[in-house]
């Protein structure tokens, strides 16, 4: 799918709709400029357009009725929310932003962050008190400089014990003091007698603009006579696609036998980057269908009738492609969108061995829409910085599989234990060690009958984290005559 063509289509669609509201006598009612952009963007591209009556192409009889409708909403955010389909159950992900520069920075790997990546659990025997554990910290971040490490435990923020009612606002602050704790299992395998006690270690950290390298760790592991490429990849960011090629070139030169792709903490990102990574793992399926796309019926019908290839993304091939017939992928509940896409879309072609816990459950993708003539990032209205990031398509693999609302279940269940995290990339790190055993046909049964109740992770506080998106590319005038 070529987003240049898509944006040209949206431009023409918007112009056709706008022509219905021409006010030749110049006496039409004035409509909010930003609200006008919001409605037209959602009308043109929103995946669930057909489910929202206010987005119907024939919703308004004339420009006065349209303007009156728009002016009923005090803010663009109010209007946007009324156009979302089942916010709590179906569309949890479409967003509107009042500063598209911040959105662009996030999608390129830059965000306001302290570099602390964590999970939250209930305390043993509690349905109210909670604690956090550090999964990893970003290199060079405030958390890294403060020497916070994977496996550290915390129970409070700014001297206030964390509870199910307060953790949201306490961890949302730009600056806060973390109150750390010690975890003890009291030398038993019984979870209910475990304790998490404050230890008087308190560290203040601040969120800053941070460039996050999505490649957290990679290495070639020699294990039981096999060479295994290991990659922890924490966000699908197109700026790092060439870096992925370099890494896989190294794997290829090391003659790796297998790949362990660690997506435990990867909330998603660019569809194009998922295609690149899948093609680096394989390579033998060049031009085969990676995934197909299903848009709202207006857009879908247009492309089916004019250029069905638009709705297909295909595998690529690189000199560094490994041509593997299987891949081991590590997942948790934090693995979402593009992470799930690569699992789902590799399954029709190779053996995908998934280890960990069930993924998040997001199969829809979005695109950034700007207030410009064609919703591209060129000639944007200078009077405001609003942009939309609505869901515009759902993804299906080559076999038509989609709609994994409840996530993708692993073949081998394995959950991290906060008191035995290990170090990322170390062969003794529990989940990696278990996977290495599978690779060498040594399957150890893991007893995990009693586990903590997971609540949330740091992505809760990152508005854009679980986006899966297509890039908004520059429109070239040479393409405008394609329609």
Residue ranges of model-derived segments:
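C-terminal motif of bacterial Sec signal peptides marking the signal peptidase cleavage site
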Residues: 16-19
């Amino acid at each position: 799918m070529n987003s240049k063509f898509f944006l040209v289509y949206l431009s023409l669609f918007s112009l056709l709709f706008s022509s219905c509201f021409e006010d030749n006598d110049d006496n039409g009612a004035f409509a909010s400029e930003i609200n006008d952009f919001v409605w037209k963007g959602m009308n043109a591209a929103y995946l669930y357009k057909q489910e929202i009556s206010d987005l119907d192409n024939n919703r308004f009889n004339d420009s006065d009725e349209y303007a009156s409708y728009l002016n009923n909403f005090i803010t663009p955010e109010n209007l946007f929310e009324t156009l979302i389909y089942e916010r709590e159950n179906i569309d949890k992900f479409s967003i509107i932003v009042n500063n598209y520069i911040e959105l662009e920075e996030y999608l390129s790997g830059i965000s306001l962050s302290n570099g602390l990546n964590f999970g939250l659990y209930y305390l043993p025997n509690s349905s109210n008190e909670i604690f956090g554990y550090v999964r990893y910290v970003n290199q060079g971040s405030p958390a890294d400089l403060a020497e916070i490490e994977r496996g550290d435990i915390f129970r409070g923020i700014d001297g206030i014990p964390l509870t199910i009612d307060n953790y949201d606002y306490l961890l949302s602050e730009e600056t806060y003091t973390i109150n750390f704790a010690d975890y003890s299992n009291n030398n038993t395998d019984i979870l209910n007698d475990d304790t998490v006690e404050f230890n008087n270690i308190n560290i203040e950290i601040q969120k800053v603009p941070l460039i996050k390298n999505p490649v957290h760790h990679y290495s070639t592991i020699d294990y039981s006579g096999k060479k295994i490429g290991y990659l922890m990849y924490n966000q699908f960011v197109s700026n790092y696609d060439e870096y992925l090629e370099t890494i896989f070139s190294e794997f290829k030169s090391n003659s790796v036998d297998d790949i362990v792709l660690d997506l435990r903490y990867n909330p998603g990102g660019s569809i194009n980057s998922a295609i690149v990574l899948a093609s680096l793992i394989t390579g033998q399926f060049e031009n085969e269908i990676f995934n197909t796309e299903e848009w709202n019926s207006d857009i879908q019908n247009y492309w089916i009738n004019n250029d069905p290839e638009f709705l297909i993304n295909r595998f690529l091939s690189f000199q560094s492609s490994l041509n593997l017939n299987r891949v081991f992928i590590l997942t948790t509940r934090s693995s979402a969108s593009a992470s799930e896409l690569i699992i789902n879309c590799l399954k029709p072609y190779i053996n995908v061995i998934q280890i960990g816990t069930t993924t998040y459950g997001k199969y829809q993708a979005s695109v950034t829409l700007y207030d410009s003539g064609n919703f591209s990032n060129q000639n944007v209205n200078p009077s405001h910085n609003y942009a939309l990031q609505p869901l515009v398509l759902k993804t299906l693999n080559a076999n038509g599989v989609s709609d994994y609302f409840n996530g993708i279940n692993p073949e081998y269940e394995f959950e991290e234990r906060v008191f035995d995290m290990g170090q990322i990339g170390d062969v003794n790190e529990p989940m990696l060690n278990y996977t290495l055993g599978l690779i060498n046909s040594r399957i150890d049964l893991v007893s995990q009958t009693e586990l903590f109740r997971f609540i949330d992770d740091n992505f809760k506080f990152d508005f854009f984290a679980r986006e899966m998106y297509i890039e908004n590319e520059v429109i070239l005038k040479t393409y405008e005559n394609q329609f």
